[in-house]
Amino acid sequence: MADFLQDKVAIITGAGRGVGRGVAQLMAKEGARVIVVDPGVNVDGSGFDQSIAEQVAQEINQAGGTAIACTESVVTMEGGERIIQTAIDNFGKLDIVVTCAGILRDRMIFNMSEQEWDDVISVHLKGTFTVVKNACILFRQQRSGKIITFSSQSGLVGNSGQANYGAA
């Protein structure tokens, strides 16, 4: 392990799979104590499997890092509050928030339901807001903190069947 992020505490949303998982693993390798946030939903947002976040946290711990799993959802303000509180309760502080949570509900817009639109917007857009807002309250008190938000090129280029994803 390196020490670039030694003694930093980082929350990574969407850390159960994909980019978020890679970010969590790299930050832990660099010395951060990591909160792996992921409710373990399928790529379309359905289901729930708390073992997804637990598995990533276990892998990080086995590799010599420090990580805990958090299965809270980012889609409610209360979930965002609980995610931030998880860092405080377990590590006494928070230094970095990385938002990578995302789902897909691909469908041509003329066939897309309002619920499919809302579900993607809730995770990508509102999910960023709920976590970042609550982190900023703490960061303001601490007088320090870093926020990293991920997006997709779909917001710039667009993909067929991903109007909701691109908008988010």
Regions found by a protein language model. Give the residues of each.
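Substrate-binding pocket helix/loop in short-chain dehydrogenase/reductase
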Residues: 108-109, 116-121
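Active-site loop immediately N-terminal to the catalytic Tyr-X3-Lys motif
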Residues: 110, 157-166
